């Protein structure tokens, strides 16, 4: 399928976008867009819109997306797939695109019984389907509600990756590249590319 990938440094970062392309390009193609208004036909040949992760305040949403807000909403409401990773997952929530049915998107580090209260990069212990993984995390989100398919969970059992119909959201970074793990405490947790396959399988789950 063809994926429209939003990029705006640093909030929806090139680093995350590059990892997404690396993980998915064996089966999917891409076209890019940013904060400038797209043409009315931009989404006509697109199957999925993707908002990656990055750095900064999620509340920059209004500035960055205002010219394409209606086009994205229309695309998803008409069955187009939405993939959100970290920042992109936050943006699916009720304060932003408001795409979800009775699901709140919130910071994992502020939830009860979390394994960390610090947002800095770490290899987060998660359970992805039936397997335990250490996945790159940078102040990612979790999801509160019942109307979702849970693909992965944090160690406190809060959802980390979910699917609701045509919407797929991930709090951690399966698209992370090897250089993201350059700190000594992260080096042992480089996934050797296995998380790319998890992301590819996840995207292929979307209805």
PLM feature spans:
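Short, well-ordered alpha-helix to beta-strand connector turns
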Residues: 46-47, 79
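N-terminal beta1-alpha1 cap of cysteine-dependent amidohydrolase-like domains
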Residues: 1-46
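A glycine-rich, often tryptophan-bearing local segment used as a flexible ligand/cofactor-contacting loop or short
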Residues: 57, 61-125
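Extracellular ligand-binding/catalytic regions of CAZymes and related secreted enzymes
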Residues: 73, 96, 174-207
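Short, solvent-exposed loop/turn segments at secondary-structure junctions
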Residues: 10-11, 55-57, 89-91, 104, ...
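Structural motif
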Residues: 48-54, 167-171
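Catalytic beta-strand/loop cores that center a nucleophilic Ser/Cys/Thr
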Residues: 117-180
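Hydrophobic/aromatic beta-strand patches that form the interior of the parallel beta-sheet core
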Residues: 31, 83, 98, 151, ...
